[in-house]
UniProtKB/Swiss-Prot annotation:
An annotated GO BP: 'de novo' IMP biosynthetic process
Similarity comment text for this entry: Belongs to the SAICAR synthetase family.
InterPro entries: SAICAR_synt/ADE2_N, SAICAR_synth, SAICAR_synthetase_CS
Record PROSITE patterns: SAICAR_SYNTHETASE_1, SAICAR_SYNTHETASE_2
Single GO molecular function: phosphoribosylaminoimidazolesuccinocarboxamide synthase activity
Catalytic reactions on record: 5-amino-1-(5-phospho-D-ribosyl)imidazole-4-carboxylate + L-aspartate + ATP = (2S)-2-[5-amino-1-(5-phospho-beta-D-ribosyl)imidazole-4-carboxamido]succinate + ADP + phosphate + 2 H(+)
Protein name according to UniProt: Phosphoribosylaminoimidazole-succinocarboxamide synthase
Pfam family membership, one: SAICAR_synt
Transmembrane portions of the chain: none
Pathway(s) annotated for this protein in UniProt: Purine metabolism; IMP biosynthesis via de novo pathway; 5-amino-1-(5-phospho-D-ribosyl)imidazole-4-carboxamide from 5-amino-1-(5-phospho-D-ribosyl)imidazole-4-carboxylate: step 1/2
The enzyme's E.C. designation: 6.3.2.6
Entry keyword annotation includes Signal: no
Annotated keywords: ATP-binding, Ligase, Nucleotide-binding, Purine biosynthesis
C-alpha cells in the first residue's frame, strides 16, 4: 500500500479548473488553456506522501527551477510563461506558482547518472549494468561515471514505482529518433548542471528531466529542473566513494523512517508516521543551503527566513 496519508483538498480559484493533485504539485488549467503548477510543501518518501510538510519547500523548488531554466535556456526551450499567480489565487501561492504552456508530455522519466548510487547501484551490483548500459567492474557506491549515462524510466502514478528501462525499450515504444533525442538532450542538460554545481562545491550525482511536445511540434523542457526533489546533490568536500554520501535532499527523512525510532514497518500497509520537528528543521535547512549555494542568492528574497 502507498499513496497519500492525507490527500489534500484542491483550492478553488475563480477561472481555474483543478486537473490533478501530485505528490508535490497541484495542477490547474486556465480558461485560456495554460497550465498553472503550484508547488506545495508536501514531501514524499518510499512512495508515500507524508502527513508532515517541510515549510517553504515549494517556494524553494520553484525558485530554484526558475534559476536553472535560465542557465539551460540555450540548450532547450522550457514551458514557463510566467511566475505570477493568476488573479484570485491565495496569497500562499506567491513564489511557488508557474504558469506554463500546455504540452503533450513524453511518458518517459529521463534520468542522467554521473555517479553510481541508489537503484542504479543495486542494478549494477546484480547485473554489472544499469538500464542496459554496461559499466566497468569494481565500481562502488559513489563512484563517478565518465561519461555520464542515460537511464530512462517509465513514469508511474502516485503510489506506484517508476520502472527503469533501457534506451532500446524507449526506442521500441516511442521510436528511435525520439529515444536518441531524449538521450542527447538529457545528457547535455546534466553536463551543464554538473559543471555549474561543481563550481559551487556541489556534486550532481543524478537527476531526472521531463519533456513534452508544444503546439509547434518542438520538444520542450517541463516540470521541475535540478532541484533536491528531482536530483541527488552531494557536498563535494565530503565525497568519499565506497559509502553512502551526505546529501542535500530528503535522505534524512528516509533514514528516520527506516530507523527503529520511527516505529514504522515499510513492508506493512500502515501509513508512515508524522516527522519529528528535528527532522523537519534539518530537511528545511538543507533545502535552503543547496538553494543558496547554487544560485548565490539568499532565500529571503522570496520571503523565506532561516528561522
Amino acid at each position: 500500500m502507498s499513496g497519500f496519508v492525507d490527500k489534500p483538498v484542491p483550492v478553488e480559484v475563480p477561472g481555474l479548473t483543478h486537473l490533478h493533485t501530485g505528490k508535490v504539485r497541484d495542477l490547474y488549467a486556465t480558461e485560456s488553456g495554460e497550465l498553472v503548477m503550484v508547488a506545495s510543501d508536501r514531501v514524499s518518501a518510499f512512495d508515500w506522501v507524508l502527513p508532515t510538510e517541510i515549510p517553504d519547500k515549494g517556494r524553494l523548488l520553484t525558485q530554484l527551477s526558475l534559476w536553472w531554466f535560465d542557465q539551460l535556456s540555450d540548450i532547450i526551450d522550457n514551458h514557463v510563461i510566467s511566475d505570477t499567480p493568476p488573479p484570485g489565487a491565495p496569497d500562499d501561492w506567491a513564489g511557488r506558482t508557474l504558469v506554463c504552456r500546455r504540452l503533450d508530455m513524453v511518458p518517459v522519466e529521463c534520468v542522467a547518472r554521473g555517479y553510481l548510487t541508489g537503484s542504479g547501484l543495486a542494478e549494477y551490483t546484480a547485473t554489472g549494468a544499469v538500464c542496459g548500459v554496461r559499466l566497468p567492474e569494481g565500481l562502488v557506491d559513489g563512484s563517478r561515471l565518465d561519461p555520464p549515462i542515460f537511464t530512462p524510466a517509465t513514469k508511474a502514478e502516485v503510489g506506484e514505482h517508476d520502472e527503469n528501462v533501457s534506451l532500446e525499450t524507449v526506442a521500441e515504444r516511442h521510436g528511435p529518433a525520439l529515444a536518441e533525442r531524449l538521450r542527447e538532450v538529457t545528457l547535455a542538460l546534466y553536463e551543464r548542471g554538473r559543471e555549474i554545481a561543481e563550481e559551487r562545491g556541489i556534486l550532481l550525482a543524478d537527476t531526472k528531466f521531463e519533456f513534452g511536445w508544444d503546439s509547434d511540434g518542438s520538444l520542450v523542457l517541463a516540470d521541475e529542473v535540478l532541484t533536491p526533489d528531482s536530483s541527488r546533490f552531494w557536498p563535494k568536500e565530503e565525497w568519499r566513494p565506497g559509502r553512502p554520501q551526505p546529501s542535500f535532499d530528503k535522505q534524512i527523512i528516509r533514514d528516520w523512517l527506516s530507523s527503529a525510532e520511527s516505529g514504522w514497518d515499510r513492508t506493512s500497509e500502515t501509513p508512515p508516521p508524522p516527522l519529528p520537528d528535528t527532522v523537519v528543521e534539518h530537511t528545511r535547512a538543507r533545502y535552503i543551503e543547496v538553494f543558496e549555494r547554487l544560485t548565490g542568492q539568499t532565500a529571503d528574497f522570496v520571503g523565506i527566513s532561516r528561522s
